[in-house]
Design a protein with these regions (language model features):
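Bacterial Sec-dependent N-terminal signal peptides
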Residues: 1-37
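Exposed, flexible binding/inhibitory loops of compact, secreted disulfide-stabilized domains
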Residues: 30-163
Length: 163
């Protein structure tokens, strides 16, 4: 009789331990984690506003802009009245700019930077590109981001987001 009670408690304990281990395994495997980008590798930036591109690019291009003179050759200021109407001022003593420019298009185009990540010897610029219906006019989609000058010597690689 004593052995039979001990046996049933022992079996019950094994079942509970197995159930606990299985539950812990399932809970740990259900969590989704984005470990691809380490927090220390993210490069902060500010998106520059109220500029227009001067020129006609025939293919997508990334331009690194390191001086006010280069900025003035590539972009004009598009100020307007009201809040937020001034073009973003860029201090080229502390920062540089990265411009991503697409060719002219008559399709509705939304282009926006998503992230800038430091990899071993380059910066990865991830962006979102959505194109819609044809319009009756042409635009030249682009964005400009302002980055700390300590990253100026890194090459830049663009990565389109497929969200």
């Amino acid at each position: 009789m004593f052995i039979k009670i001990f046996d049933s408690n022992y079996i019950m304990m094994k079942k509970l331990l197995l159930a606990f281990a299985t539950t812990m395994f399932l809970l740990s495997s259900c969590g989704t984690s984005k470990m691809g980008v380490e927090k220390s590798n993210i490069v902060s930036y500010t998106e520059a506003r109220n500029y227009f591109h001067i020129g006609n690019e025939t293919k997508p291009i990334i331009k690194k802009i390191t001086s006010q003179e280069t900025l003035a050759k590539e972009f004009g200021e598009a100020a307007f009245m009201g809040k937020g109407g001034e073009p973003t001022k860029i201090d080229f003593n502390k920062n540089f700019a990265i411009a991503y420019i697409l060719p002219q298009t008559n399709r509705k185009t939304d282009l926006a930077p998503l992230s800038l990540t430091l990899k071993k010897k380059h910066l990865e610029l991830q962006y979102k590109l959505e194109q819609g219906k044809a319009q009756t006019y042409f635009t030249q989609p682009f964005f400009i981001i302002v980055v700390d000058k300590k990253y100026v010597d890194y090459s830049i690689v663009d990565i389109k987001s497929w969200d």
